A protein has these predicted regions:
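Aromatic "clamp/platform" in nucleotide-sugar-dependent glycosyltransferases that forms part
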Residues: 283
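Carbohydrate-associated surface elements
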Residues: 164, 184
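Conserved acidic donor-binding segment of nucleotide-sugar-dependent glycosyltransferases
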Residues: 315, 319-326, 334-339
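Short hydrophobic beta-strand element within catalytic cores of glycosyltransferases
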Residues: 300-303, 320
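Conserved donor-binding/catalytic core segment of Leloir-type glycosyltransferases
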Residues: 7, 195-212, 217-221, 234-236
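Nucleotide-sugar donor phosphate/pyrophosphate-binding loop at the beta->alpha transition
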Residues: 122-124, 131-151, 187
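Nucleotide-activated donor-binding/catalytic signature segment of Leloir-type glycosyltransferases, i.e.
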Residues: 245-263
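N-terminal subdomain of nucleotide-sugar transferases
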Residues: 1-53
Length: 374
C-alpha cells in the first residue's frame, strides 16, 4: 500500500492555552508519519481573543499542524457551534484525507462522524480517556454516553491504549471492532542512562493533580527520611509546584527534596536518566506514557496497581502496590536498600523498544488503516 493521507483530529491536543494537553496524541501522529502522510487539525476556544477565528498553521516535528482558535463565550451551545465551524474552516485548508484518525470520544469528535456522512471518509478513534474506566462510570452523564455511542457506532475501529480500557468499553456495551494500540515512546530520545546518580534518587513527574497524590508521595518521603538519609526525591511537572514547595518548607525538607516546573520531553528524559526509581502513585490511570519513558531510560518504577499499569509493570521492572502510603513506604525502602533485583537497564529499554517504539506503533496503526482502506 502506498502512503496514505491521514488526518489526526482530537478532543485534546497541545495548544497555546494547554501546552501539554494530549501530547500523547501528538506522539501517535508523529509515529504514524513514519509510514504515512500525516496532517493534524485541532480546534479550541480562547476567551481572551477578539477575533471569532484565528488560524495557527505550523510545521511541528515535520507534521503540518493547524490549530484553529475560536472566540470562547459563556454560552456552551454557541461554543460548540463555533468549534464545529472552526473544524470545517480548518478542514477546507487541509489535504483531503484517505482516513481520519480521531482521538477521545467526546463531543468534538462528532466532526469525524460529520466527515464520514458528508465525504464518506472512514475514521478510527484512539481512546485514552480514563472516564470510560469502570471506576469512573458513575460520573458519565447520559449526554456523554449518547455522544460516545454515536461516535463509536460510526467508527471503523476503536483503538483503546490498554487491554484494561478495552474490557471496560466492552462492558459499557461497545460493539464496534476494537484493538489495543498502546501509547508510544521515542526510544531514541529516552535512551539508556550511562551512569547512576551518586545519591539514590526517586523521581515523580506528573501534572500534580490530586489523583496523582503528590502530597502523599512527599509525606512518605518525610517518613522515610526519619530512618534513612541516603536518598533524595525530585518531584514536579505541569501543575501546582508552589503548593509542594510550601509543604516542603514547612517540613524543613529542602535539603533532600527538590521541585521543578513543566519540562520539555528532552528534560524529562534527562531527569529519568539521572534517577534510580520512578514513582507513580495515582488513584487511577489508563496506560501512562511516563512509565514507558522511565523504563526506556533503564529506570524501574514503583506504581499503583490500577488501570493498564499491570500491563507495563511487573516484578522484573518495578513494584506494583495499592494506593496505600504504607505500601509506598515499604516499596521505597526495599528499592533504597537494594533488596529487589530488577532486570538491567538494557533489558528494560529493549522491552519498550520492542513493543512501544515509534516504529512498532506506526506498524500497528498502518496495518489497521490497510484493513479499512483495502
Amino acid at each position: 500500500m502506498s502512503k496514505k493521507n491521514i488526518l489526526f483530529i482530537s478532543s485534546w491536543f497541545p495548544n497555546k492555552i494547554e501546552p501539554t494537553n494530549g501530547n500523547f496524541v501528538q506522539r501517535h501522529a508523529e509515529a504514524v508519519s513514519f509510514k504515512n502522510e500525516v496532517e493534524i487539525l485541532h480546534c479550541i476556544g480562547d476567551s481572551s481573543q477578539k477575533n471569532t477565528y484565528i488560524f495557527d498553521d505550523k510545521i511541528i516535528n515535520g507534521i503540518r499542524t493547524l490549530v484553529v482558535y475560536y472566540q470562547n463565550t459563556k454560552n456552551p451551545l454557541l461554543n460548540f457551534s463555533r468549534r464545529m465551524t472552526g473544524y470545517k474552516k480548518g478542514f477546507a485548508k487541509m489535504k483531503t484525507p484517505d482516513l481520519v484518525h480521531a482521538n477521545v470520544m467526546q463531543k468534538s469528535m462528532l466532526f469525524a462522524v460529520y466527515l464520514k456522512m458528508k465525504y464518506k471518509i472512514p475514521f478510527v478513534i484512539t481512546e485514552h480517556w480514563s472516564g470510560f474506566l469502570n471506576i469512573n462510570w458513575s460520573k458519565l452523564s447520559k449526554v456523554q454516553l449518547f455522544i460516545s455511542k454515536i461516535i463509536a457506532k460510526n467508527a471503523s475501529y476503536i483503538l483503546p491504549v490498554s487491554q484494561y480500557l478495552l474490557s471496560d468499553l466492552k462492558n459499557l456495551g461497545c460493539k464496534t471492532k476494537m484493538k489495543v494500540v498502546e501509547n508510544v515512546v521515542d526510544t531514541h530520545l529516552f535512551k539508556i542512562k550511562s551512569e547512576t546518580p551518586e545519591i539514590f534518587t526517586f523521581l515523580h513527574i506528573s501534572n500534580l493533580i490530586p489523583l496523582k497524590n503528590p502530597e502523599k508521595i512527599l509525606k512518605t518521603a518525610f517518613k522515610l527520611r526519619e530512618k534513612y538519609s541516603n536518598f533524595r526525591l525530585h518531584i514536579g511537572g505541569d501543575g501546582d509546584v508552589e503548593n509542594l514547595n510550601k509543604i516542603i518548607r514547612n517540613n524543613k525538607a529542602e535539603s533532600f527534596i527538590k521541585t521543578f516546573p513543566m519540562l520539555t520531553l528532552k528534560e524529562v528524559s534527562d531527569k529519568m536518566r539521572n534517577s534510580d526509581c520512578f514513582i507513580l502513585f495515582s488513584d487511577y490511570e489508563n496506560f501512562p506514557c511516563v512509565l514507558l519513558e522511565s523504563l526506556s531510560t533503564g529506570t524501574p518504577a514503583i506504581a499503583t496497581k490500577v488501570g493498564g499499569i499491570p500491563e507495563i509493570i511487573n516484578k522484573k521492572n518495578g513494584i506494583l502496590i495499592s494506593n496505600s502510603e504504607a505500601e509506598l513506604y515499604d516499596a521505597m525502602e526495599l528499592v533504597l536498600q537494594k533488596k529487589v533485583n530488577f532486570d538491567n537497564p538494557k533489558i528494560l529499554h529493549d522491552f519498550v523498544e520492542n513493543h512501544f517504539s515509534m516504529e512498532k506503533i506506526a506498524e500497528k496503526f498502518t496495518n489497521i488503516y490497510k484493513e479499512i482502506l483495502r
